[in-house]
């Protein structure tokens, strides 16, 4: 997989000459445009001579008025404007020659301060020099009283120190002159007098001038002094000195400051940059069209705030030149220099200043840095996400008559979206001579335009998108179908994937334009192809609500119905009998098996007749002829199960019906199983067709069933009052125990809650029995079929609401005894409001949290793409069932973890027979065989052990869950992994929302915060578990005042070595005396600190721990996520190493680099016979990992923009554009999917789809 564009983007410091070479002229005046003529002022910030003409090929003075492209490249002799296109005003830069050097604020203030590190100053000292508070010694000359780079602070509190420094130096000069009458002696004596008395001010300039005269010492202040010092740095020499110092102090001392300095020195040397370039002598002026002035209605103007910042610089620069010419006192000049420095700082990064420059509305002006960073910055707003043409949005409504690959687009919207294509069609078919005529036809609503529209919409699908787009199914393609009205019509089955409902949701429509885009939309994104959800490989298009209800009603059986016992010889005969009202839909009838499709039955079965209903005949007609006949709720073995409904013709049908037990109708669960089996057997295309038939049948019969719900359907439940009386008595008893001091407050609360929970459970059980007796009760039908609601809702309607949560989310002791049917009392209503409100507040907060989690996950994993077939990895990953060791229950069974993965080696049973050969994809069948053989641990190929330098291979990834086939090369599995973990994150959060705050339903505090804790690699203080550092046996547990000391003994070469672990107060122990422990084993309850685990037990232990813990959180919420997605994120978290010894490589001790970069350096060192570096594994949270990415563009667009860019500039980093984000920013095709493998195959698939649809 080669990167097709082979370009790199490099960022580095610009020298003054470089900036001048970019420039097209110097800006010397602060004016922008003339208020009368509204034309650009000469030499100002919008000058046409510098930046190019405002109108194409027209000059400023009016000599060249007519825009004539023939004049391109000429210059107007009168006004000097080059005649060219006005677009150059977006790219031509100017410059300002600064009267005095200024430092770049990033180099001074972004921590760690780069200039301070280079000059070995404290950043505070550096700032004092730059902002004209303190002087600095540039060269001590022959004076022994000063050191180079010493800062002379004149702040009131610190001037004492400076006075005592200057005193001896001046005394020395008096001795040197040795002439009491000399002018300088008199001057020196006056100075000494001022220095000795702290209340008298003294002139430091005078003092330093005198010292310089006699000792050749040099002093400086401001950026020019810093520039002077930076020029003095000899990189090679400094690198050598720093390395020697590092060697001298040894590896264990605190050497972080030296290492930082060495890093900067080496970076500058490697990237051929001079330190003094960090100080600006020339300031670039960005092109005027990027900082425009815009005229508003009413003749007023508004301008980009950057212009204000530039004006301020130019004004101060001019003033400084004037002051210098006039020969003003140094204090005035220094003040002007300081103001220029601050003006430049404000332009570059206003928010970093202690007192930012403010606009009229008292908020800081937006500087160049703030234009880059944040959600509204250039990176995220304009480079990673753009607004697109040919798009529209509207409210969605249900489209029950659509096919699964269609969407209804309102006619007016379609006309606007497809306007260019309509115009083209009208011209081609000679209804319009030119574009103008065609546009006029559209304006006048000519009937021909609708014919044109009908034709052109067949050429291209549209993309529908619903925000928030949490996973790849949030954007799908559909063939447009014109509909009346203004709402977009959406197929009811795709709503789950979009997480849409029809209560006012809006969706956006986009039209793909190019041939390739159209082909991709058709071949890869069509709604009818998205049958499976990528996160778990389960069908995502499961029917809901009305469709379930209709199918339930159609497959319902009842004895004693009209036409029961009628025998039919043909399917059509039975259906006609139903249509004419001879037989009811749910009556049990007989039909000759021979009349039904032959493939559905065995030879033997076809000799008898089948007991069924007309509804079931209609239901089975939606399936393919080779799909088994479904007559009951056993789907997996439908072919055998149907035997119990087939009778020999010798048996009388009425007799058979009398002995026959009614079977339950088809419910939601069965429909899901049918879809799964159907998909595996027939693929996406046929499944979509079947689903459309299922939908039509469902809607038809849910309408015919006339199911409604009213207060009359909800039976009153009188028994509850007896239970209440009994419970009240128990509670009174508990309270009296508490009053007598036999129970603590906590115990009392616990027991009361238990009593009321039991009551509610009991009422719920009894209600279930009551409900089941009336199988036609609409509430029962809805709950039983899975269409809507459940028994808990029903309990609340007629039984009791039960216990509620309080504002903190704890359970209250007072239950709500009323049901909704009776109505709640005022106090009960009040108690129930807490939970419901908390649910709403949680939802709002956690949705944002979850969205941010997804964003960070995408950033950490975006560069992972499937790049080849097999990496030939020499290591596998051993897995077993995920077991919650605390409660000893299975969270993820082994089968779920191995299906769809490749085996690493032969998997054999006890006898040595091979069940699955090496490198074979394990299907469901093989997985069952492995489990049947009693195997509990399996070594599989995993992303975690994949050997590819970049990306992963097909074998290590395994099956693509969204297509149920092997993953294709080019699949961006990193992003899919991030979406699959992030998308249910919102469900983790929304769970509290649906229960209306009913107690007992766990509020998800362990959910999202726990995931964040694991992936950010943080642990909450106080909840950290103690882990064993070495293997051994727990030889003793000593308890002293609630604090345990666990003693672990290990045997090393025959000697017993003890290690003691002190626990927190009242910590819960996880081990007993005599237990064997392995490194990393938990000794106390709590969450493990991942850094410690990595240190003690190595990477595999960390990988397994994160996998298990993340799975635990999701599975407890009933959400299934495939292991491989979590593995990808974990792979990225463990992808970095920290250099411990740099050997003879250019890597520095303490530097964090990616494993692939480290491997490259080691290989290179070995090849050249140098000592290779040594490093240890690092685990980085998903917040930190992207910032350490190989690509600086990707890191800068994630977070900490200024810091990432400053670092990249000093290192002169190159971005090889290997990830997805970098290429999106530059408008390239991403190196994934068709951008990697080419589009030919996709074009062919799309062509075939198109033929079949129209």
UniProtKB/Swiss-Prot annotation:
SMART domains: RPOLA_N
GO CC annotations, alphabetized: DNA-directed RNA polymerase complex
Cofactor(s) named in the record: Mg(2+); Zn(2+)
Pfam families recorded: RNA_pol_Rpb1_1, RNA_pol_Rpb1_2, RNA_pol_Rpb1_3, RNA_pol_Rpb1_4, RNA_pol_Rpb1_5
Annotated positions binding Zn(2+) 2: 871, 946, 953, 956
InterPro entries in the cross-refs: DNA-dir_RpoC_beta_prime (IPR045867), DNA-dir_RpoC_beta_prime_bact (IPR012754), RNA_pol_asu (IPR000722), RNA_pol_N (IPR006592), RNA_pol_Rpb1_1 (IPR007080), RNA_pol_Rpb1_3 (IPR007066), RNA_pol_Rpb1_3_sf (IPR042102), RNA_pol_Rpb1_4 (IPR007083)
Enzyme class: transferase
SUPFAM superfamilies cross-referenced by the UniProt entry: beta and beta-prime subunits of DNA dependent RNA-polymerase
Binding positions for Mg(2+) per the UniProt entry: 501, 503, 505
The EC number(s) this enzyme carries: 2.7.7.6
One biological process term in Gene Ontology: DNA-templated transcription
UniProt entry keywords in alphabetical sequence: DNA-directed RNA polymerase, Magnesium, Metal-binding, Nucleotidyltransferase, Transcription, Transferase, Zinc
Cofactor binding notes: Binds 1 Mg(2+) ion per subunit.
Cited NCBIfam families: rpoC_TIGR (TIGR02386)
Cited function: DNA-dependent RNA polymerase catalyzes the transcription of DNA into RNA using the four ribonucleoside triphosphates as substrates.
Membership in a protein family: Belongs to the RNA polymerase beta' chain family.
SUBUNIT field: The RNAP catalytic core consists of 2 alpha, 1 beta, 1 beta' and 1 omega subunit. When a sigma factor is associated with the core the holoenzyme is formed, which can initiate transcription.
Protein name listed in UniProt: DNA-directed RNA polymerase subunit beta'
Organism of provenance: Mesoplasma florum (strain ATCC 33453 / NBRC 100688 / NCTC 11704 / L1) (Acholeplasma florum)
């Amino acid at each position: 997989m080669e990167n097709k564009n082979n370009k790199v983007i490099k960022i580095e410091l610009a020298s003054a000459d470089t900036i001048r070479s970019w420039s097209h002229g110097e800006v010397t005046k602060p004016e922008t445009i003339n208020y009368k003529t509204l034309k650009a002022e000469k030499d100002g910030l919008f000058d046409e001579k510098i930046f190019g003409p405002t109108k194409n090929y027209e000059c400023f003075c009016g000599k060249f008025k007519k825009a004539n492209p023939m004049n391109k490249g000429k210059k107007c002799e009168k006004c000097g404007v080059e005649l060219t296109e006005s677009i150059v005003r977006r790219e031509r830069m100017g410059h300002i020659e600064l009267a005095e050097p200024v430092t770049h604020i990033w180099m001074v203030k972004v921590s760690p301060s780069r200039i301070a590190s280079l000059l070995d100053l404290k950043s505070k000292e550096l700032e004092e020099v730059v902002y004209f508070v303190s002087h600095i010694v540039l060269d001590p000359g022959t004076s022994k009283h000063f050191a180079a780079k010493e800062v002379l602070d004149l702040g009131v509190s610190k001037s004492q120190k400076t006075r005592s420094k200057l005193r001896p130096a001046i005394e020395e000069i008096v001795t040197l002159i040795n002439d009491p009458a000399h002018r300088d002696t008199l001057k020196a004596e006056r100075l000494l007098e001022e220095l000795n008395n702290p209340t008298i001010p003294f002139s430091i300039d005078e003092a330093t001038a005198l010292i310089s005269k006699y000792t050749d010492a040099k002093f400086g202040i401001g950026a020019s002094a810093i520039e002077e010092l930076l020029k003095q740095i000899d990189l090679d020499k400094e690198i050598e000195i720093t390395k020697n110092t590092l060697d001298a102090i040894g590896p264990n001392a605190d050497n972080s400051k030296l290492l930082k300095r060495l890093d900067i020195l080496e970076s500058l040397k490697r990237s051929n940059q001079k330190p003094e370039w960090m100080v600006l002598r020339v300031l670039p002026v960005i092109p005027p069209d990027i900082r425009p002035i815009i005229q508003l209605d009413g003749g007023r103007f508004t301008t980009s705030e950057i212009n204000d910042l530039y004006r301020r610089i130019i004004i101060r620069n001019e003033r400084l030149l004037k002051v210098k010419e006039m020969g003003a006192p140094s204090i005035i000049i220094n003040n002007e220099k300081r103001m220029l420095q601050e003006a430049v700082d404000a332009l570059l990064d206003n928010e970093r200043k202690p007192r930012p420059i403010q606009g009229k509305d008292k908020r800081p002006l937006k500087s160049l840095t703030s234009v880059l960073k944040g959600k509204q910055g250039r990176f995220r707003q304009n480079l990673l996400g753009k607004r697109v043409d040919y798009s529209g949005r509207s409210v969605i409504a249900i489209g029950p008559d659509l096919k699964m690959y269609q969407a209804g687009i309102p006619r007016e919207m379609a006309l606007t979206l497809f306007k260019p294509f309509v115009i083209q069609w009208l011209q081609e078919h000679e209804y319009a001579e030119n574009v103008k005529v065609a546009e006029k036809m559209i304006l006048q609503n000519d009937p021909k335009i609708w014919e044109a529209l009908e034709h052109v919409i067949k050429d291209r699908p549209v993309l529908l998108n619903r925000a928030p787009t949490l996973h790849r199914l949030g954007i799908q393609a559909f063939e447009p179908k014109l509909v009346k009205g203004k709402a977009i019509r959406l197929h009811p089955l795709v709503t789950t994937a979009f997480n849409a409902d029809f209560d006012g949701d809006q969706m956006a429509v986009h039209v793909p334009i190019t041939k390739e885009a159209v082909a991709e939309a058709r071949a890869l994104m069509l709604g009818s192809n998205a049958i499976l959800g990528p996160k778990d490989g389960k069908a995502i298009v499961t029917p809901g609500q009305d469709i379930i209800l209709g199918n339930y009603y159609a497959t319902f059986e009842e004895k004693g119905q009209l036409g029961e016992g009628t025998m039919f010889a043909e399917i059509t005969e039975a259906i006609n009998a139903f249509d004419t009202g001879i037989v009811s839909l749910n009556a049990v009838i007989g039909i000759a098996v021979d009349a039904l499709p032959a493939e559905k039955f065995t030879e033997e079965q076809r000799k008898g007749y089948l007991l069924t209903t007309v509804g079931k005949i209609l239901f089975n007609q939606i399936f393919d002829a080779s799909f088994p006949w479904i007559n009951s709720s056993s789907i997996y073995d439908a072919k055998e199960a149907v035997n119990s409904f087939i009778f020999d013709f010798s048996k009388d049908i009425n007799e058979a019906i009398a002995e026959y037990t009614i079977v339950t109708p088809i419910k939601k669960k069965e429909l899901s199983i049918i879809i799964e089996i159907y998909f595996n057997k027939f693929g996406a295309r046929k499944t979509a067709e079947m689903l459309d038939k299922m939908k039509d049948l469902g809607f038809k019969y849910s309408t015919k069933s006339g199911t409604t719900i009213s207060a009359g359907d909800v039976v009153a439940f009188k028994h509850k009052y007896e239970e209440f009386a009994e419970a009240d008595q128990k509670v009174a008893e508990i309270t009296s125990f508490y009053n007598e001091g036999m129970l603590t407050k906590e115990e009392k609360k616990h027991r009361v809650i238990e009593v009321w929970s039991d009551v509610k459970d009991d009422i719920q059980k009894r209600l279930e029995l009551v409900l089941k007796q009336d199988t036609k009760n609409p509430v029962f039908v809805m709950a039983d079929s899975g269409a809507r609601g459940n028994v808990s809702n029903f309990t609340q309607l007629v039984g009791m609401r039960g216990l509620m949560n309080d504002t903190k989310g704890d359970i209250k002791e007072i239950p709500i005894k009323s049901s909704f049917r009776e109505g709640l009392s005022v106090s009960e209503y009040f108690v129930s409001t807490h939970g419901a409100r908390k649910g709403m507040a949680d939802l709002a907060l956690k949705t944002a949290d979850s969205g941010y989690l997804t964003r960070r996950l995408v950033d950490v994993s975006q560069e992972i793409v499937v790049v080849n077939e097999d990496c030939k990895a020499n290591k596998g990953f051993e897995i077993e069932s995920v077991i919650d060791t605390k409660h000893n229950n299975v969270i993820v069974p082994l089968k779920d973890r191995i299906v769809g993965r490749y085996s690493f080696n032969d998997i054999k049973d006890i006898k040595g027979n091979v069940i699955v050969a090496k490198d074979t994809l394990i299907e469901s069948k093989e997985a069952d065989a492995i489990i049947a053989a009693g195997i509990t641990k399996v070594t599989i190929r995993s992303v975690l052990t994949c050997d590819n330098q970049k990306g992963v291979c097909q074998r290590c990834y395994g099956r693509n869950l969204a297509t149920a086939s092997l993953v294709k090369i080019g699949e961006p599995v990193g992003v899919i992994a991030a979406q699959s973990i992030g998308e249910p994150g919102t469900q983790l959060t929304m769970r509290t929302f649906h229960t209306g705050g009913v107690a007992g339903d766990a509020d998800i505090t362990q959910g999202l915060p726990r995931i964040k804790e694991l992936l950010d690699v943080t642990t909450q203080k106080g909840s950290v578990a103690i882990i064993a550092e070495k293997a051994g046996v727990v030889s003793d547990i000593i308890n002293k005042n609630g604090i345990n000391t666990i003693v672990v003994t290990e045997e090393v070469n025959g000697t017993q070595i003890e290690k003691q672990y002190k626990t927190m107060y009242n910590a819960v122990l996880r081990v007993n005396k005599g237990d064997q422990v392995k490194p990393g084993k938990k000794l106390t309850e709590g969450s493990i600190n991942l850094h410690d685990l990595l240190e003690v037990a190595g990477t595999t232990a960390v990988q397994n721990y994160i996998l298990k813990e993340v799975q635990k959180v999701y599975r407890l919420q009933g959400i299934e996520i495939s292991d491989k997605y979590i593995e990808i994120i974990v792979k990225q978290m463990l992808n970095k190493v920290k250099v411990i010894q740099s050997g003879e490589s250019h890597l520095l001790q303490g530097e964090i680099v990616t494993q692939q970069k480290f491997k490259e350096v080691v290989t290179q060192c070995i090849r050249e016979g140098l000592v290779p570096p040594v490093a240890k594994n690092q685990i980085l949270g998903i917040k930190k990992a992207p910032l350490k990415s190989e690509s600086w563009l990707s890191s800068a667009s994630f977070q900490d923009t200024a810091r990432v860019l400053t670092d990249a500039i000093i290192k002169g980093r190159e971005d090889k554009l290997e990830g997805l984000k970098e290429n999106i920013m530059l408008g390239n095709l991403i190196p994934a999917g068709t951008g990697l493998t080419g589009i030919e195959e996709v074009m062919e698939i799309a062509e075939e789809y198109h033929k079949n649809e129209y």
